[in-house]
Amino acid sequence: MAHKKAAGSTRNGRDSEAKRLGVKRFGGESVLAGNIIVRQRGTRFHAGSNMGIGKDHTLFALSDGKVQFEVKGPKSRKFVSIIAD
């Protein structure tokens, strides 16, 4: 006769790895060409001047300068630009 209750099974206990999304360089920071500014899913931030966009919607600097965030347009879209020094 068992003196301990048998262990139950569970369907929990899994989680996906964090993807490290978000803003990597903030407004006013100096960046070099090629630096990643924002990692995102979809275009929460849009590419402004001197910015490139990767196939996974990553925004990166195309030239050296300072990062500038701005909201513009009738839909109040957030744009990220690089202002040359």
Swiss-Prot record:
Keywords: Ribonucleoprotein, Ribosomal protein. PROSITE patterns: RIBOSOMAL_L27. Gene3D superfamilies: 2.40.50.100. It holds the Pfam family Ribosomal_L27. Residues 1-20 are annotated as: Disordered. NCBIfam families: L27. Belongs to the bacterial ribosomal protein bL27 family. This is Large ribosomal subunit protein bL27. The gene is rpmA.
